[in-house]
Regions:
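A short, structured beta-strand-centered segment in the mid-to-C-terminal lobe
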Residues: 621-629
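Cell-wall glycan-active module
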Residues: 2-101, 105-107, 111-112, 116-119, ...
Length: 730
């Protein structure tokens, strides 16, 4: 049963310690303590499994909270657990600036813990730097460099030693160009002398996701263009592209090596920067030079969209002939053009061809759903069902599949076919357990999962086991990540990850975990979520196997800022999982993100709304980019929208997005008591999708973290990754 219960909350902790004589050391537990992130241990025999461990179960605790238990484990006889405990104790002592004690704990640890030998040497050097003994500190850094010269950890020694001997910095850049310390060196050297194309290109290649890279690129292009070779221009172009500087990217792609992707992005960059005539010319060059490349099909579609109807139809016909993966989309576009030309019979023939020959395409699914909705609007529910039922059967991976299957059940209810409706809802829950419509189906089946009228009052129990194991990376990286030593794991991964343009499934999943560990949640969630888009058969099979694991889904639905969310959810009597679900949709847990409309932070609070709330609660100073302030103000407003609509969460969440006045207008306008029909009737496409996304997020947090609901869903679905019962309740 889902129950109301009270929580005991623990504030997160974040420490950043600067060691004397060495660069800033970010406490490795910072993100996982400050943000309350929990990436959980999956079940089943697969690459994500982590054996039970007393040490790993303590990773989520602060140094003071875990010290006693780690000491007890460290006193045991020689074992892996003992070595792990000693390593964490030493790391915690360094954070607490107790160098002498850390040195003692680290003594001879390499003998029992060889996979972290290089990092033990690093910890020893960091510990000595706290003692004030310059001679031994220097010796420790030299020892690290000599004994582990081929390890990426050597970059840390090269960074420190290079402060007095500049050749070490050049050695770091040469040996470990992608290591964070090498990038730090490049930035420092560019401050001294900005005109160094080699270093600017280094940052463009390995640090392009930082927004401050754009001025670096601008300087490089304006001052050193004559020195750049085509491959350099490709590096610059990609960095501009990733930062959405499409016009600048187009200029750079024009000078890059001629490949289908580069030429396509050249044309697309021109189009996005409103240079349509030039874009058309480049698209035509692409199609002529690479007639069978996938990008040529994309270019033909772009040309069709910006051309006059008859010319557009010729482009679409070429797509149908040469690019079967894009044929469905091309046929729909052609049919729409024929409709506009008043050639209704020809349009009908094209749509029939779509269904007959390309019935498994996304375009066919979307067309079927369009017709099904039209039939349902006329209350012809039998015809609507006939059109919709092919979608989950032939397009099971399409986003419309669970929606169509759900509405088949709703229409069956209207026809008085209650058994058929029950079968349809069970089908949705069985085949699409991750969908918003699975939650709605579970509700209509009478399962105890909450609904729009009760979800606010529920305080679900949820369980937070230990972190998942990365699929890719060295044994050292996996061990560091399990131990919560995030800064060291991330630095190591930045060197080991050599194929970011074409990563394997395992590499992309691991990269997503590292972004989550850095607190860059939008990128991390996106990397993990878009694994489902793989279409190469082998990679698709790898994703299907991964998606059966609980750890994959829990990484996709993480818990940043959990302590703050719990605190303010309790303050305003809100379901903490619903608050988390809303934040995931609003900001992907990015505290400084801003919308084009001006909304700010985790819960995307508008400045004017924030001022109104602050006056109501007598808060004189606040910062919407501060998670504490943003969640305090956002949950107040979430409470307000719930109170305005009598705790009916459907309307409260819709009004959070569209404003309560619009929701009140819709209530008067739409004559329905059916919540599902109301959602479908919302005239704002953004708000309609927003409602489904927020409650879909809520459902996923519930089914992935609540043991009771997880077991309930598992009774219906064999693709739902159920939880085991050996997890600790939050």
């Amino acid at each position: 049963m889902l129950q109301r219960r009270s929580y005991a909350f623990a504030a997160g902790v974040c420490l950043f310690i600067a060691l004397l004589g060495v660069p800033l050391i970010v406490a490795n537990y910072n993100n996982y303590r400050e943000n309350g992130i929990a990436l959980l241990r999956p079940q089943g025999k697969n690459g994500l499994d982590i054996p039970k461990s007393g040490v790993l179960s303590l990773v989520s605790l602060s140094p003071s909270e875990r010290a006693g238990r780690l000491q007890a484990i460290a006193q045991q006889s020689s074992s892996r657990e003992r070595s792990r405990a000693r390593y964490l104790i030493a790391s915690d002592l360094i954070i607490q600036r107790q160098g002498d004690k850390a040195i003692a704990v680290l003594q001879d640890l390499e003998k029992d813990y060889p996979e972290l030998a290089a990092h033990i040497a690093l910890k020893r050097a960091q510990a000595y730097s706290l003692t004030g003994d310059k001679v031994r500190t220097q010796a420790a850094w030299q020892d690290l460099l000599q004994r582990h010269s081929k390890s990426p950890v050597a970059a840390e020694a090269l960074f420190v030693l290079g402060k007095n001997e500049p050749q070490y910095w050049q050695e770091a850049i040469a040996l470990f160009p992608s290591h964070p310390r090498s990038l730090d060196i490049a930035r420092l050297l560019l401050q001294e002398n900005p005109q160094q194309p080699r270093l600017q290109l280094l940052l463009a290649q390995y640090d392009y996701q930082k927004p401050e890279i754009v001025p670096v690129l601008d300087r490089l292009v304006s001052q050193s263009a004559a020195q750049l070779k085509p491959q350099h221009w490709q590096t610059v172009a990609q960095a501009y592209w990733e930062n959405r500087e499409y016009g600048k990217a187009a200029v750079a792609y024009a000078k890059s090596p001629r490949t289908p992707r580069n030429v396509y992005r050249w044309g697309r960059g021109l189009q996005l920067s409103t240079k349509q005539t030039e874009a058309i010319s480049v698209y035509k060059q692409l199609v002529a030079a690479y007639p069978n490349a996938e990008e040529s099909g994309m270019a033909l579609m772009r040309l069709a969209r910006i051309s006059k109807p008859k010319e557009a139809i010729s482009y679409l016909d070429r797509i149908v002939t040469r690019f079967p993966k894009q044929a469905g989309e091309a046929l729909v576009a052609k049919a729409n053009l024929l409709d506009n030309l008043n050639s209704k019979q020809s349009a009908a023939k094209v749509r029939q061809l779509l269904l007959d020959k390309y019935g498994d395409s996304d375009a066919a699914a979307e067309y079927r759903w369009q017709v099904a909705q039209e039939k349902a609007a006329k209350k012809d529910y039998q015809a609507a069902t006939r059109w919709a039922e092919a979608i989950p059967q032939r397009n099971s991976e399409h986003i419309l599949a669970p929606r169509a299957a759900f509405w088949i059940g709703k229409w069956a209810e209207k026809l008085g076919k209650n058994e058929d409706a029950k079968t349809a809802f069970e089908y949705v829950l069985s085949k699409f357990p991750q969908s918003y419509y699975a939650w709605r189906s579970a509700t209509l089946l009478g399962l105890d999962v909450g609904d729009f009228t009760t979800v606010r009052q529920i305080n679900p129990d949820f369980s937070l086991p230990q972190r998942v194991l990365p699929l890719a990376g060295s044994p050292a990286l996996k061990e560091l990540y399990q131990l919560g030593q995030d800064a060291d794991a991330i630095a190591l991964w930045q060197v080991e990850y050599s194929n970011p343009e074409k990563p394997t499934v395992a590499e992309q999943f691991t990269d997503g975990l590292m972004y989550l560990a850095k607190g860059e949640n939008l990128i991390g969630i996106n990397e993990i979520s878009t694994l489902e888009d793989r279409d190469i058969p082998l990679e698709k099979a790898e994703y299907q196997n991964l998606s059966k694991q609980l750890g994959y889904w829990q990484a996709r639905y993480p818990f940043p800022y959990l302590p703050l969310i719990q605190t303010w959810a309790q303050q305003h009597q809100l379901n903490p999982l619903l608050v988390t679900a809303l934040i995931r949709q609003e900001s992907r847990f990015e505290p400084t993100i801003r919308s084009v409309a001006g909304a700010v932070g985790l819960m995307q609070v508008m400045p004017g709304t924030a001022q109104y709330i602050a006056e109501k609660i007598n808060v004189s100073e606040y910062n919407l980019e501060n998670p504490q302030d943003n969640i305090q103000l956002g949950t107040w407003y979430m409470d307000y929208t719930h109170n305005r609509f009598d705790n009916y969460s459907l309307l409260a969440i819709a009004s959070y997005n569209a404003g309560w006045s619009n929701v009140e207008k819709w209530l008067k306008r739409f004559n329905t008591q059916d919540p599902d029909e109301f959602v479908e009737s919302i005239p704002f496409g953004e708000t309609q999708g927003y409602v489904r996304q927020v409650f879909g997020n809520y459902w996923n947090y519930l089914r992935l973290y609540n043991p009771q609901v997880s077991r309930l869903v598992a009774k219906y679905s064999d693709v739902h990754p159920s939880m085991s019962i050996d997890v600790a309740s939050n």
